Amino acid sequence: MGRLSKKIRPTESNLSKIPNQSGVYLLYRGKKPPYVGKAGPGRLQKRIRQQLNTRRGITTIRYKPTRSEREAGVWEKKYRNKYNPTQKRI
């Protein structure tokens, strides 16, 4: 699959364009390291929406669709180690 998306704002218009498949996502709150998460098959858009409902202050989102939940887990680990190696949460 491709690269991470460009940073997008969490607007309804942008969220509706996120595909319904497995993937990894990064949620940014200002300049803090991003929250890194993954979504199983058919759940990328839904999972991002769920996170936005529970996490306040998210300003931008990036995501990467994957072919499987396993692949999403591999990318989640890679991005977590890159952006926030000591913890997962922002």
Predicted region positions:
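GIY-YIG nuclease catalytic motif and its immediate N-terminal context
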Residues: 1-53, 59, 66-78
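Active-site-proximal loop/helix of nucleotide/amide-processing enzymes and allied scaffolds
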Residues: 81
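Coupling/hinge elements of helicase-like and P-loop NTPase modules
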Residues: 84-90
